[in-house]
C-alpha cells in the first residue's frame, strides 16, 4: 500500500488553507438582527441625528456588548437599514459580525458617519419585506432571526403592515418594535403619529409578532438611544419581555 509523502501532506494542508468555504456554508452566530430605522418625512434632521447617535450609543453600550458575548457563539450578526415610502429602503451597514467592544465601536462609528438615505412616506410593510430579504441573504446562520423596527407613525404607504408581518412570522422571523412617540401638538399629521388607541397599540396589533415579541416606547427622539439600549439587551439575551396583546 502506498502512503502519501510528508511533502504531499504539506501541500494538501496548504491547499486546504487557501480553499474558500463551500458555497452556502454560513458562519454560525447567536442571532441575525436587522435594525430597520424609519427615516420618513416626520423624522426631521434633528430627530434623524438623535436616532443615529442613539443607535450608535446603544450598540456600543457595555451591557449590550456583554449580552452579545454571553451567548454560545459569543457574537451576533447585524444589518442596519433605513426605510420610508413603499419600495424606498436602503442598507446603510451590511451584515457584520459583532463579537466584542472593538467590533461594536467600529459599527457605531460607521453608523454616525453615513449620510441619510432619503425621506418619504411611511411603509412599515415594505420595511418588513425588505428586512426579511436581508435575513434570507445573510452570510451567517442562526436559529433566531429578528427584525427590530423603529418608527414614529403608522403604515400609510404600500400594502397593510399586518399581512407583511404574517408572512415574516411564517418564515420563523421575530419582529419587535421601538415605538417613538410624538406629542400631538408637535405632529403635522396627528392621525399618523397618534392613531386611535395610540401608536404603541397599533404596533402591537399590526407589526410585532413571534415568540416573545415586544414593543419598547421612546417618549421622544431624545430618549431613542436609552430605549434602544434597553431593548437590545432584552432582545439579544432572549429574555421574556412584554409580549404582544
List each model region and its residues.
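VWA/integrin I-like adhesion module and closely mimicked acidic/polar interface patches used
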Residues: 154-202
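C-terminal "exit" segments of structured domains
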Residues: 215-245
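Solvent-exposed loop/turn segments at secondary-structure junctions
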Residues: 39-43, 85-88, 151-157, 180-185, ...
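N-terminal secretory signal peptides and thylakoid transit peptides that target proteins
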Residues: 1-15
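Short beta-strand-loop
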Residues: 74-110, 190-196, 200-204
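Second-shell loop/turn segments in exported
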Residues: 36-46, 94, 111-121, 151-155, ...
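Von Willebrand factor
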Residues: 27-94, 105-150, 179-189, 195, ...
Amino acid at each position: 500500500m502506498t502512503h502519501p509523502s510528508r511533502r504531499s501532506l504539506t501541500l494538501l494542508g496548504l491547499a486546504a488553507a487557501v480553499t474558500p468555504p463551500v458555497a452556502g456554508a454560513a458562519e454560525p452566530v447567536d442571532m441575525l438582527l436587522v435594525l430597520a430605522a424609519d427615516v420618513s418625512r416626520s423624522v426631521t434632521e434633528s430627530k434623524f441625528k438623535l436616532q443615529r447617535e442613539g443607535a450608535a450609543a446603544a450598540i456600543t453600550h457595555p451591557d449590550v456588548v456583554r449580552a452579545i458575548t454571553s451567548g454560545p457563539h459569543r457574537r451576533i450578526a447585524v444589518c442596519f437599514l433605513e426605510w420610508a415610502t413603499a419600495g424606498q429602503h436602503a442598507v446603510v451597514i451590511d451584515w457584520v459580525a459583532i463579537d466584542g467592544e472593538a467590533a461594536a465601536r467600529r459599527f457605531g462609528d460607521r453608523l454616525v458617519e453615513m449620510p441619510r438615505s432619503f425621506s418619504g412616506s411611511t411603509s412599515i410593510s415594505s420595511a418588513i419585506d425588505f428586512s426579511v430579504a436581508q435575513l434570507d441573504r445573510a452570510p451567517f446562520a442562526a436559529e433566531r432571526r429578528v427584525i427590530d423596527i423603529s418608527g414614529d407613525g403608522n403604515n400609510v404607504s404600500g400594502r397593510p403592515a399586518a399581512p407583511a408581518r404574517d408572512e415574516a412570522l411564517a418564515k420563523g422571523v421575530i419582529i419587535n418594535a421601538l415605538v417613538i412617540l410624538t406629542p400631538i401638538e408637535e405632529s403635522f399629521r396627528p392621525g399618523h403619529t397618534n392613531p386611535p388607541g395610540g401608536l404603541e397599540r397599533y404596533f402591537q396589533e399590526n407589526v410585532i409578532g413571534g415568540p416573545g415579541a415586544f414593543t419598547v416606547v421612546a417618549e421622544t427622539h431624545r430618549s431613542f438611544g436609552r430605549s434602544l439600549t434597553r431593548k437590545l439587551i432584552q432582545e439579544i439575551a432572549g429574555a421574556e419581555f412584554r409580549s404582544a396583546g
